[in-house]
């Protein structure tokens, strides 16, 4: 049972109450009693509006369901659009405008670069992500399939000089492309020196040359004639050539280069939403405490690796001498956003005056802003924002009224915490259909505080399926990627953002590369997101961030956005194309293949979520390829099966049989995990297995197809069950 403390009209879980009072409020400039009374007032004032917005979601869904049923077999696009306008689903568009957000850090407004998303429940992962601002290109190439293992270049258990030579050659080729020399190639270099404020490169034949664009030299470490590091800059991102002739790699390199370090994850989203399993007060405090440790700069994580005990901490800033003899300090860490939850869920961390759980998004807004305030008032080892801003990502909003509510919430939090108006900046996830179609209006509601919009294919597909559940059977999951609506959605996000003045002011982001082991493929494909106008895109690991950084050297994002700025196309008719299959011709084998893939994916993710509280993990798919799974991937998998079930493409018995068969596969895939609880053969006794079934068999009724209500309920059940067994 959770122990509560009465704080005015609200009851606060003791674990949260003590954390806030003992750790967050000291040195915050806030009075404890006033903080809690203001919090209670905010809850009382904003809860009714939150409820209204959720009721509006349900009302719209009911109207959609009825319309689709009535028009099945006689769908008329113009009639459909008129209906969506009548019910307020399609909003009248606001006049043209430009955002006016100010005090935005360069990492968001100016620098284009990779963005990491990492669960706040895992301190080690969070530290790794924060430190992924800089990454070793040599390590990223050597340790992944980015460099092939052909011709004796296997990775192996010890250093392979053949592979090392391939890595070095790749690095030199990169330097030739990003920071070319006037004559010769970086491959010919035997020495790098700083002479009269310029980079002088000596080649094997004794000739000297310099940079084709001398201004790309930014700084160095060590002595000018014999630097230990040379700092260059291309397309807004830094490149550090590290030189050490005594180092095992430097010894083998004719110029003594031991590594090329790239500025990589310029920004990171510290996630308290889709990648975490936080279902109660205790879990929420873990999330908040790790965020506070990151902001203060004193978070540590100790772990064992290869038999050694290691402690991870935040990296310090990086110091250089400038070519003209000055000093330069660059951040050693990624600029941090925090992702709050959306408007849907409540949490038992606080009970309101009626004894009801408070909306989790309201709790998140207050507590995470209080945490990040400490960075603004000098209470932390490092600055997060150099511009005095707090960055919050707000997900899963449907239409502009919900974005306006987030704005009102942030206004109230600023007043409560003594922050100037628009100190709290918002990143709006464009991952629900009603937001995609009304994106201009959504941005308008937060035009003074918005710093990012981002497309999320997976959640957005989940909403696509659930919205039009009654329209008919939907395309197979992999076929969704070639849908008309999806191409329109991706183009529209960029076009609307650029038209609203995002260039040089805010991020336009694109989605996750979900296969952390397939880096060669990522290098081939992910550059397309930048060519489409994004100035940031999501990556699953620090290594992926380092490799994705290469794309930003190949593509000048600012130039791409300048070209695309004239795109005034309206993509909404494309976005409205429903991915329904009118006369499905799938064979029995194809249907079973889709069931196998989705059931295995659901079980592989849900079993860790429910039994171990792991909200984001690399889950092997049915072909044993590791895929990064979070609640967004779960939403699409569960909704596609719920849709097929509803339209008779498959039967409940078929799905249940598939779940049972796939449970054995997932059990086998997790056999090496000592904390794993098998689902087979006692399916009725496995809360995780039951949760997976619920997600599909109750998928039709779930609000907007969200997975959180079932996951939270079942995780709480599992926690209680495991605790009872331990007693």
Swiss-Prot record:
It catalyses: glyoxylate + acetyl-CoA + H2O = (S)-malate + CoA + H(+). One of its GO terms (molecular function) is magnesium ion binding. Pathway: Carbohydrate metabolism; glyoxylate cycle; (S)-malate from isocitrate: step 2/2. Its EC number is 2.3.3.9. Acetyl-CoA binds at residues 117, 124-125, 275, 312, 540. Disulfide bonds: none annotated. The active site is at residues 339, 630. It is an enzyme of class 2 (transferase). Pfam families: MS_C, MS_N, MS_TIM-barrel, MSG_insertion. GO terms for cellular component: cytosol. The modification Cysteine sulfenic acid (-SOH) is found at residue 616. It is found in: Cytoplasm. This is Malate synthase G.
